[in-house]
Amino acid sequence: MLLWLIFFTPGWTLIDGSEMQRDFTWHLRKVPRIVSERTFHLTSPTFEADAKMMVNTVCGIECQKELPTPSLSELEDYLSYETVFENGTRTLTRVKVQDLVFEPTQNTTKGASVRRKRQVYGTDSRFSILDKRFLTNFPFSTAVKLSTGCSGILISPQHVLTAAHCVHDGKDYVKGSKKLRVGLLKMRNKSGGKKRRGSKRSRRETSGGDQREGPREHLQDRVKAGRRRKQSGGGQRVSEGRPSFRWTRVKNTHIPKGWARGGMGDAALDYDYALLELKRAHKKKYMELGISPTIKKMPGGMIHFSGFDNDRADQLVYRFCSVSDESNDLLYQYCDAESGSTGSGVYLRLKDPDKKNWKRKIIAVYSGHQWVDVHGVQKDYNVAVRITPLKYAQICLWIHGNDANCAYG
């Protein structure tokens, strides 16, 4: 009942009076162009890195304030990207950035220094999605599970967005990523299998004739029994099934050079995202990519995401919480989460400018519970990597193969 209220209550009822006058609308904006310049063949990776659900100490929001704004050439280096294919071959694509307008640094939220050193803060506020009515429908059906232990989200008929560290540790690809698979949610019967077809026909043939030749009252009894079963079990059938996964191989993986640094420095948390192309297209409804607004333009300052937390085996876990701090590239938040949920797509629900309904879009990738350098002191945060105009343009290029459909986001 609580989930029903959350997802079917109009968005404006979740906003307090002070926010009623704010513009909570998706606004299309022109984004920079990212153009592929040249592609090089690289040596095949060894796929020997250990998968890490937590990145080593990184430069976070406070640390980034002390760094100079990256130049255009530095941005082009970070946004150049590696592609690793299912046969183990690897390429590097250099890009050029055009029509870039540098944006001012985001003002961070006050009072964000208070943290508790746990991934679950106080009372666990996560929801396990067990009801088939929710589990197999949008937006929960967009969540996927990676064979390396992370989560991800469907953003096209053939693409999954996830965290880069789920497949690459910054220096090499993790073990198991050469034969990476993605699990899409499906429901299975209690018996664990499908009903065999043709069983009625076989029974008729075994009995030696058409069952319509039997007494009429037997047929009526069977009809009545079927009705009783339907009436008694109809309300329970929704929750009878258990979630399982239909696994699909990954055709290729794209990772920004800002993360895949090799031996040329530490991976930058700002670029902890990757795109997976599936070998087979799916038929599920996917979630569109959006550009992350500021906290002030998020209803209640709230974000949402669903993933497969390791402490709840094979259960899809949903949560929503407020954002506590932001920079141009990162969001800090108090969402309760455990390892396994990293790579989940963080989304918002805002008004569609052309319609009266509210629409969900992905605005960040959950990077997980990270140790962040704050003025030389290590502190732990739950971090999400924002979809900026540049990252939107890059991911759009990965999906379409060119920038023709990536002018606005």
Swiss-Prot record:
Keywords: Disulfide bond, Glycoprotein, Secreted, Serine protease homolog, Signal. PROSITE patterns: TRYPSIN_HIS. Residues 188-203 have a biased composition (Basic residues). Glycans are attached at N87, N107. Residues 120-404 form the Peptidase S1 domain. InterPro entries: Glutamyl_endopeptidase, Peptidase_S1_PA, Peptidase_S1_PA_chymotrypsin, Trypsin_dom, TRYPSIN_HIS. The keyword Cytoplasm does not apply. Residues 204-224 have a biased composition (Basic and acidic residues). SUPFAM superfamilies: Trypsin-like serine proteases. One of its GO terms (cellular component) is extracellular region. It is found in: Secreted. Its main location: secreted. Disulfide bonds join C150-C166. Residues 188-246 are annotated as: Disordered. Residues 1-17 form the signal peptide. GO terms for molecular function: serine-type endopeptidase activity. Belongs to the peptidase S1 family. This is Inactive serine protease 35. It comes from Macaca mulatta. The gene is PRSS35.
